Amino acid sequence: MNIDVGRQSNGQGHETVHAGFPADQSGLSADRIQMFCSDRGRNAQGDDTSGPGSAAIRANAPRAAVDRMIAAFTSFLAQEMGVAEDVVEFDGETFWAPGSNLTPTMLEAMEMARAQGRTDLQRHAARAGLPDSSLPDGANISEIVIDPEAGQTDQVRYTVVDDFGNLINLMSAEGQVNGGAAQGLEQTMLERVVFDAEGRLLTVSFLGCALPRASRVPMIGITTEPVPLAQNQLGMNGSGEAGAAGAPVAVANAVQDRGIRQVDMPFTPSRIWEVLRDVSEAAEQ
């Protein structure tokens, strides 16, 4: 089975998710499913990889295609089994019908059709749309310790509770949240664009950027509370930007809990120290 996806995979795990779902639905082994990402020679439609929608939206198309495959082979196999079409069932692994000893898998059904020259059963296409967008929800809690003498802010605990609806692959979803939260935490604490007095950009490479470091990111506690999305036949929500979107707000709220009412990101030690000094001086007046 070949699947053409109009979004490029940049580490999101599209290959695992998009192949895993039709494998479960069709009974085919995942290693028999090949995925092509943003190949304009095969698929003229597509868009950018952004927002939490690759699996939640695009997995509906393979589902529709698998449903069409099942319907097409049900009609074909009914004739082979000598039974009425409406008694043929597909249980996720094999086709079967009362009164027949034939129990072919999807792959075996394809081979039977090929042997009879039924090339019309070798290719199936379907379109699927959604009445509404992906609507993920969740909460992020940041617990920090601030050293007022140095302005150093340490992230000691970070907890996430997310509702992504039904999950195809829990490990992949948790990886999205972990990576996004790590990027969001470092963006909040250190990452910034720096210009000199003449307006020349100084942070021109990764050597000058504060990239996330494992030593600065605590173990992130992730809990999922799935509520199936009614607008999606699969009940799925997106998860792509949940970690990165929640982290800056959670950390900013934690910093403000120290009595700091206004400070711009990133919350560098020098910036936090200056604000705490101003707060202390204002309290003494």
Residue ranges and their predicted role:
Residues 1-285:
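Cofactor-binding beta-sheet edge motifs in enzyme active sites
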